[in-house]
């Protein structure tokens, strides 16, 4: 089972919230106190909630479900991309396009366009075009890759969202809520936990904290997938023995 511990969270600075004047009262029950006008998050509360979220993700991955990793702000984007790719999950690291979930039909058409352009770039079609046309298509390809590259292999709506900074990704959460897609989210002291099914109270800015969340989630996914593969192997091995007994 995927687990994080208190020491890891303290080292990563998960407990440092935002300045006290920016607090959201809805996060009050997760705040331990304040130090130098900075709210301190109660990690005794965070620990079980974080681990519950990891268990949920591991279970989803074991069932071959897709978890969409979402983190488009500068401090999160690169890590989101790396960790999602490492565990084979879709991601949005650049900008959330309105309708990415609620208007998936249109998004699917854009993904098809992206795939077509990728093929053209590889099969020599670009070389046969005028310089201007080739440049325009290259720019199109770059733009689409930046916006949709992380979800081009998603193959349909995700089964859950994992979000870094729920304020920054509020549109994504609203869309998931409309469609009944569960949301796992890191919620800092200045944010609202509304619309988040699995709340992880914690610092959503510090690079080390963001790294910890994403690394732990990726590990949970990998463990879930490995567990599913192992049990599938065991099932195959045991099946003939059972039928032989019958």
Curated annotation (Swiss-Prot):
GO molecular function per UniProt: structural constituent of ribosome
Ribosomal protein found in the keyword field: yes
Keywords associated with the record: Ribonucleoprotein, Ribosomal protein
Biological process per Gene Ontology, one example term: translation
Presence of keyword Ribonucleoprotein: yes
GO cellular component, one term: cytosolic small ribosomal subunit
Coiled-coil spans in chain: none
Name of one Pfam family that matches: Ribosomal_S2
Top-level taxon in the UniProt lineage: Bacteria
PROSITE patterns: RIBOSOMAL_S2_1 (PS00962), RIBOSOMAL_S2_2 (PS00963)
S-S bridge residues: none
Protein family: Belongs to the universal ribosomal protein uS2 family.
PANTHER family: 30S RIBOSOMAL PROTEIN S2 PROKARYOTIC AND ORGANELLAR (PTHR12534), SMALL RIBOSOMAL SUBUNIT PROTEIN US2M (PTHR12534:SF0)
Protein name, as recorded: Small ribosomal subunit protein uS2
The organism's taxonomic lineage, starting at the top: Bacteria, Pseudomonadati, Pseudomonadota, Gammaproteobacteria, Pseudomonadales
